[in-house]
């Protein structure tokens, strides 16, 4: 008794039964017009005009014709094979059980659906439609290749005696149509009908398992694996498919066990393992396996090289990449392979060797679109935007290739950055015109573009309209929020994504939204910005559970998050646990110690970094100078500045000069800072250095140099509000209220708006935001009342408000009211009222903490007996028992 397939459904009949055949005079395919003359005269005339060789071959036997037909199919002369069949029909030679399978194979390889249907009608006419299982199996294959799932099922359902080939054809077809569950159901029915599976069956079934979501796919895959072991069917073909399945499902340990236990490892086996390792970001291990493969005497091919080169690219292992390039050059024409060429271009560009990438590109004769895309992306990621756009134009105009979604992923960022491309949004119109606007890859790129242009609302609109969002889409939108400093929105979107992922794990969806390393390294800066320590710890726990905590990018982000949430000890612990530290990791930990005022530890880390063979870069020294500045280590900072080129090989840039100006200015050595400004190379951008000098002038009330710095800054950066605010502060402190008012008026006329002071504090699962002078928070009235009470207690302890921080020329009591509404005071009050006694209060602020808030927080910490950690835009302040960790040096 046959097994009723679980996926049975009703379809309209698309194949006429013999009694319903249409007359052959209708709906003819051009090939078959010759085979259906209306009279003997037309028969001869058609034959003479279309195939004069027929008269020569009329004496040939039917067997000769059928052998001729089959030989043409074997020789891949597909169209000639069809014409041979036409000649047979004209001569009245009846096709048999051997002719139709060969003919149907030819039509399947041609992927000609219309011709296939006509031949199918002939099959019924000559009586092979139901009883000949061989012909029926070939028909299944025909409709699979022509992409007609309904026809595949219909033909299969009418096979009276299904054999192994019938089931193999069906299961293979279902996999081709990505009907993975149905393929497994068909496999079960095959077993129920006592049809013995072959190795080809198991390959298709394992492929189906690899495309099911976890844990279902893994469970089914293991069952098929066990079945193969029991039946002794595990040949190299199946082993390779199992290795690929375990790798795709993230079970690399099982892939490696299979590889180790399999004696007949061939090139395909190795390539499968290498590909799985790279897909699962086990890049160093992939390179180790490549070495083992070569030692076993297995020569890499183009698939090996193109699979492993991305590992060199991501790890920036230029030397290994060059070795693979040399191997490709040495071994035949591997370097001429388009996939290898594209991978080489990507590797060189990712290692900042753009010229080497271009040489590979120029040396390729067969430049497919993948190669063009790799070179455009290489230029774009290295910010060679002009070259990227020129190459894009050349690809379309000279090479005649049309841009696809991958092309646009490289072109769009180049357009956004390029000064020559003023109408940035016009690229969106180009995408729509090319019909690429519904492509998910392109939509992700457009979302990123609008985020970087500051139009996060348009990015969100694109995201909202997308029907098919994958993990990359969610990561892109989260990145957009983080880039635009919409940190609360980024965390909310992550929460929404996690809720959808829970539905995925319950089988409600097939698209996995499980956060990966990119998700974590993207969202952790938002936790840091909001000082959301609890959320950061939650993400850290997830990273540990999913073996992502030791990833260098995730690890570096965790180091930064803990440091910016005030947990320097935990930051160092995470740093020490990262197995492969890169220069970014070292820079982050040095910056962390600097933010906390531990300058000597930062310098010790610089030395340790050198001992471990990691060369410092430009950012390293910015971190070191910042650490020296916040710790008052002026002489040590100057010493490092003057030896950074001879001892470390790093040329001082404008950013380094700005840091050293800050170092000197913060220490009150403003004239020296001004002299250093004048020593800067003429072509350097001096905005950063002038800004440091202006800030120092504000701290030390140096009106003369402050005015010079502000005038130069406003000329260089007329739209930056902080320059006007600092100058107005200097004038206010000096009692020059008219000048302060004039600065504010100029600021207003220029359309420059001061960024409002914002502070954040985490409580429970929420991050609460406070804005200076804002009363929209639900506890606003309660907080104001508490601060008034606290104010009186502080006065009794000797607190005198520093009203020099108020820019407005108003009465002293009004200035005090304005000071009381500063955002950090509101956040601290919220923390005191909403947490239990003894709990550390952690607050983050978007601007530099003012003198009065710094003074007030010292008094508050003593009165309420709380430790208060306040992070402003520059550094950390740890208040305890009336003192601050900065020693009033900030």
UniProtKB/Swiss-Prot annotation:
Residues 765-795 are annotated as: Type E(+) motif. Belongs to the PPR family. PCMP-H subfamily. This is Pentatricopeptide repeat-containing protein At3g57430, chloroplastic. PANTHER family: PENTATRICOPEPTIDE REPEAT-CONTAINING PROTEIN, TETRATRICOPEPTIDE-LIKE HELICAL DOMAIN SUPERFAMILY, DYW DOMAIN-CONTAINING PROTEIN. GO terms for biological process: chloroplast RNA processing; mRNA processing; RNA modification. PPR repeats lie at residues 61-95, 96-130, 132-162, 163-197, 198-231, 235-265, 266-300, 301-335, 337-371, 372-398, 404-438, 439-473, 474-504, 516-550, 551-581, 582-616, 617-652, 653-683. Residues 689-764 are annotated as: Type E motif. It holds the Pfam family DYW_deaminase. NCBIfam families: PPR (TIGR00756). Keywords: Chloroplast, mRNA processing, Plastid, Repeat, Transit peptide. InterPro entries: DYW_dom, E_motif, Pentatricopeptide_rpt, PPR_At4g14850-like_plant, TPR-like_helical_dom_sf. It comes from Arabidopsis thaliana. Involved in RNA editing events in chloroplasts. Required for the editing of a single site in ndhB and ndhF transcripts, which are two plastid-encoded subunits of the chloroplast NAD(P)H dehydrogenase (NDH) complex. Required for the editing of a single site in psbZ. Required for optimal activity of the NDH complex of the photosynthetic electron transport chain. Disruption phenotype: No visible phenotype under normal growth conditions. Coiled coil: none annotated. It is found in: Plastid, Chloroplast. GO terms for cellular component: chloroplast. The keyword Ribosomal protein does not apply. Residues 796-890 are annotated as: Type DYW motif. Residues 1-44 form a transit peptide. One of its GO terms (molecular function) is zinc ion binding.
């Amino acid at each position: 008794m046959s097994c009723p397939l679980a996926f049975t459904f009703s379809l309209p009949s698309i194949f006429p039964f013999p009694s319903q055949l249409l007359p052959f005079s209708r709906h003819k395919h051009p090939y078959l017009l010759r085979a259906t003359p209306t009279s003997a005269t037309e028969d001869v005339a058609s034959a003479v005009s279309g195939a004069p060789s027929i008269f020569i071959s009329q004496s040939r036997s039917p067997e000769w014709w059928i052998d001729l037909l089959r030989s043409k199919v074997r020789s891949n002369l597909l169209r000639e094979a069809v014409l041979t069949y036409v000649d047979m029909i004209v001569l009245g030679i009846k096709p048999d059980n051997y002719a139709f399978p060969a003919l149907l194979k030819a039509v399947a390889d041609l992927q000609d659906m219309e011709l296939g249907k006509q031949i199918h009608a002939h099959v019924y006419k000559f009586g092979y439609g139901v009883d000949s299982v061989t012909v029926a199996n070939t028909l299944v294959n025909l409709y699979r290749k022509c992409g007609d799932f309904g026809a595949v099922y219909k033909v299969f359902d009418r096979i009276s005696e299904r054999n192994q080939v019938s089931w193999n054809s069906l299961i293979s077809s279902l996999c081709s149509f990505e009907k993975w569950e149905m393929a497994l159901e068909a496999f079960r029915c095959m077993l129920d009908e006592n049809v013995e599976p072959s190795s080809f069956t198991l390959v298709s079934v394992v492929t189906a398992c690899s495309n099911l979501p976890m844990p279902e796919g893994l469970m089914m895959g293991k069952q098929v694996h066990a079945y193969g072991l029991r039946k002794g069917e595990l040949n190299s073909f199946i082993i390779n498919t199992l290795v690929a399945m375990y790798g795709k499902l993230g079970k690399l340990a099982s892939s490696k066990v299979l590889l180790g236990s399999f004696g007949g490892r061939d090139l395909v086996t190795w390539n499968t393992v290498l590909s799985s390792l790279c897909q699962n970001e086990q890049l160093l291990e992939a390179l180790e396996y490549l070495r083992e493969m070569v030692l076993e005497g297995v020569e890499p091919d183009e698939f090996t090289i193109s699979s492993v080169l991305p590992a060199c690219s991501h790890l920036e292992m230029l030397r290994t990449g060059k070795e693979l390039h040399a191997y490709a050059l040495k071994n035949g024409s591997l370097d001429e392979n388009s996939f290898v060429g594209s991978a080489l271009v990507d590797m060189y560009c990712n290692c900042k060797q753009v010229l080497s990438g271009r040489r590979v590109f120029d040396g390729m004769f067969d430049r497919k679109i993948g190669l063009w895309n790799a070179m455009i992306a290489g230029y774009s990621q290295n910010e060679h935007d002009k070259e990227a756009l020129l190459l894009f134009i050349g690809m379309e105009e000279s090479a005649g290739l049309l841009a696809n979604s991958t092309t646009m992923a490289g072109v769009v960022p180049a357009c956004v950055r390029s000064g020559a491309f003023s109408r940035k949004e016009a690229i969106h119109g180009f995408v729509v015109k090319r019909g690429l606007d519904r492509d998910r890859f392109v939509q992700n790129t457009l979302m990123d573009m609008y985020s970087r242009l500051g139009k996060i609302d348009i990015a969100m609109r694109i995201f909202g309209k997308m029907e098919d969002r994958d993990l990359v889409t969610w990561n892109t939108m989260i990145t957009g929020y983080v880039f635009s400093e919409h940190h609360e929105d980024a965390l909310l979107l992550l929460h929404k994504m996690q809720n959808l992922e829970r539905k995925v794990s319950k089988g409600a969806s097939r698209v996995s939204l499980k956060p990966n390393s990119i998700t974590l390294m993207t969202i952790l800066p938002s936790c840091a910005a909001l000082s959301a320590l609890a959320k950061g710890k939650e993400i850290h726990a997830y990273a540990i559970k999913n073996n992502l905590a030791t990833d260098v990018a995730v690890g570096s982000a965790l180091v930064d998050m803990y440091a910016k949430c005030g947990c320097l000890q935990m930051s160092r612990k995470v740093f020490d646990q990262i197995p492969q530290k890169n220069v970014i990791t070292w820079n982050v930990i040095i910056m962390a110690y600097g933010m906390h005022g531990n300058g000597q530890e930062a310098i010790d880390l610089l030395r340790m970094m050198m001992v471990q063979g990691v060369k410092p870069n430009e950012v390293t020294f910015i971190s070191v100078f910042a650490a020296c500045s916040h710790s008052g280590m002026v002489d040590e900072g100057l010493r490092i500045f003057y030896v950074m080129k001879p001892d470390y090989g790093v040329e001082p840039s404008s950013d380094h000069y700005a840091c050293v100006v800050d170092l000197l200015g913060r220490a009150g050595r403003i004239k020296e800072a001004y002299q250093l400004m004048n020593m800067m190379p003429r072509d350097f951008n001096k905005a950063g250095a002038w800004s440091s000098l202006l800030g120092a002038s504000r701290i030390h009330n140096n009106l003369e140099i402050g005015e010079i710095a502000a005038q130069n800054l406003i000329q260089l950066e007329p739209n930056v509000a902080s320059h006007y605010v600092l100058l107005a502060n200097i004038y206010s402190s000096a009692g020059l209220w008219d000048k302060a008012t004039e600065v504010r008026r100029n600021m207003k006329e220029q359309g420059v708006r001061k960024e409002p002071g914002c502070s954040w504090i985490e409580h429970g699962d929420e991050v609460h935001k406070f804005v200076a002078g804002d009363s929209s928070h639900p506890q606003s009235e309660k907080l104001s009342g508490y601060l008034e009470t606290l104010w009186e207690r502080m006065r009794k302890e000797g607190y005198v408000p520093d009203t020099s921080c108020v820019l407005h020329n108003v009465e002293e009591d009004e200035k005090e009211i304005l000071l009381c509404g500063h955002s950090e005071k509101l956040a601290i009050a919220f923390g005191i009222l909403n947490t239990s006694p003894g709990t550390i209060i952690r607050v983050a602020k978007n601007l530099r903490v003012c003198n009065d808030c710094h003074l007030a927080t010292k008094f508050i910490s003593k009165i309420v007996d709380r430790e208060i950690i306040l992070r402003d835009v520059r550094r950390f302040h740890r208040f305890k028992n009336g003192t601050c960790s900065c020693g009033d040096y900030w």
